[in-house]
Amino acid sequence: MKSKSFSKILLFTLTVAGGSSTVFAEEAADTIATGANKGEERNVMLNASDATKPREIQIGLPSEDVNVYENGLPAVYSSSVHQLARHWRSDASLQDVGLITPMESAIKTGNIAYSIDSHSKLGQKEFKGIVNYRTNLFGWQNFDMNVSGGISDKWLYTASVYQNFDPGSFKPKFTDFSDRTQLYHAGVTRLLERGSISILYKYSKSNGLGSMVNAAPFIYVGDGSVKEIPGFTLGTTSYAPLGGQFKYMDVMDGKIKTGQWGDFTNNRAHEVSALFDYTLGNGYQLNLRAKFMDAPQANYVDFGGSSIFKATAADNLFKDGSDTPYTGLAEGRRTWLHIGKVMNTLFTGEASKRFGNHDLRLGLNEWYYNLDYHSSSFQWTGTVSAYPDILEKRYDDGTSDKFRGFNELSPEYTKGYENKLALYITDSWTVTPKLNLYFGGRLEYYRMSADQIPFERYSGFHIGDTHTYADGTTVKIEPRRVIKNKLNYAATLQGTYQFTKNFGVTADATVATRFPRINEYAGTGPTDEQYKRVTIPLIRGGITYKNRFIDLTSMVTYISKSNNIDQQNVTKPGTTQSKTTLLIYGIQTLGWTTSAEIHPFKGFNLHALFTYQKPTYKDYFIKSPFEGVPDLNANGNTVKEIPQILIELDPSYNITDDIRLWLSFRYFGKTYANLTNALYFNGRWETFGGVTWNVNRHLTVGATVINFLNQKGASGTINGAELISKEEAGKYSNFYMSGSYLRPFTVEFSTTFKF
């Protein structure tokens, strides 16, 4: 549950790309859907960094966690332990996928974000089936299917299977696949005179390597560009170790244990949902959603790095079976083993009715989340090479080790629950044919009861240990129970006014508050003095214009977040020494976005978007844990990883009624790669393209090209660079570093068969 990167707005269309499938919504009059309000749809899976996740566009705020909902409830309650990609994919089980706006999300869930709004196929009276198959040049095999139909006049059924076999763009040596995911869905629906009731079951089993295979070494040139290290091709060469056993200290008992790479990525969950939709005699629409999910395995592994250095004989580093000291490039590497068990019970009920010009909605959330989680960490030194060797460190006293620094870097533990009980109301009021007002409010009672270990971590840290710190304080390392009872609230107001048939204005203001969540207590956690309300205001305003050729919106946006909690691992520049520090800070972003849908002639469509934004840190201060390294004051610095300029261009053309060509261009402007804004990456284009051919009413074939400009580069942050100052930046010209990279040039092929 290490610190997550900064959050992102999700923009979607229903287009296939990467290792997760997407289905096209089928509109059928006699098909039972779950009755959601569908939002604007954009590219769901066009992600140039990760094939298993929806595409994300940054807006400069720390992540508010899960932004994917299935049948009106979170697909996973929190992705901090039970990750979204381990339990949800946009597959053939879904009837439709749309968006929830930030205003709706704030009121219905307490979270300000654009969110995926997905709904299951429930069936129809006639039999229908769909089979999707996808593959690519690297050997990816993806299969998913759904069958649905009628059992009798009053009963419907649905069943789906999803299978993903993804080796990635290179083969890991310690396992066959970088992502192996299985999803199974089954459900029955009983048709009522004025509604329906459905029971759905879902089973997920998934293993994903994640950051174990998503990092690589490169040469940072110094001007924002990177070069490949000779013999190491970014995106197609593995920086994960060969395999074999490793040693770690279990944070739960302090025992030294052994494990295998890939053995700590098991995820398994059972889920049962009930959906009830009914139209009452007085015109009220009643929608009830309930879900129980049990994930006895919610595990994953994180890899991290520090500084790359040139090893000498004096470092006493050796490859296996060699008595000659290693004298090549090496990097201090870190590993976190995350072990979790998750269980939640979720209920949402809504009653809605139209009164004259008012559309009123009254809702209730009762969401319970139980978490049992811990992580252990260790450090090792590896060669900077493809499939790096883990080097043995030999000491003057005759001892040696490969793995060290046990639980020195942010081992975590928490066990407990949180519960949200909320009442909300919304009203869409058509004041006049030209003026519409939308407003809503939410009041939430939040209770958390969780174990916390508030003590500074050190090498050998574990539950049950007794430790004396540098200041002479001796403590017993054991959990302490934290109980919080708080009220959260959210409110929103939007107004739109249409001056003419074509031209209008729109403005909205939304605010949501919350207190620290259970996952934020897994580290040292906030003290009582640090426990403060998190407030997120969002204010937007702009113009709209629409005619037969163009649909345009241009808006100015302000959004901020106070008291954000972040656990940051910092490295002493030029070394492999690292420490963990808890940070509480704010962020604010002012931006301007213009989006347009353009239809200049029949068959051609262009989606275009331009964003300029300025996300900056507030009250961001790191007291340096290293002698000789100054403290860091990042106030006013641009948020790392967040580009100030974003451009989207998505042209498509229907050559015939059955053949469609499409392209997708994403430009991400200059992004800073560390907190001090000393290091940065130049702007880059992420590109996709494809063709879809509806051969007949049963068969559709397609091809997709990812990164067709074949750009090779790094993105995100640079390992070990957190405290490098602007004055020191010049020293890092043509410097060896490591970080994440773009997906390589890939061609994918798809076939869909409907019957």
Which residues does each PLM region occupy?
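N-terminal periplasmic accessory domains that precede
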Residues: 56, 68, 84-87, 97-99, ...
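Transmembrane beta-barrel wall of Gram-negative outer-membrane proteins
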Residues: 128, 135-166, 170-242, 264, ...
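Conserved C-terminal beta-signal and adjacent last beta-strands/turns
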Residues: 11-12, 148, 537-541, 637-755
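Structural signature of Gram-negative outer-membrane beta-barrels, strongest in the C-terminal barrel
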Residues: 342, 361, 365-367, 412-561, ...
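Gram-negative outer-membrane beta-barrel transporters
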Residues: 558-561, 578-676, 697-698, 750-754
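Acidic/polar loop-and-plug regions of large Gram-negative outer-membrane beta-barrel proteins
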Residues: 191, 196-273, 298-336, 389-411, ...
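Short acidic/polar hinge/loop motifs at secondary-structure boundaries
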Residues: 73-101
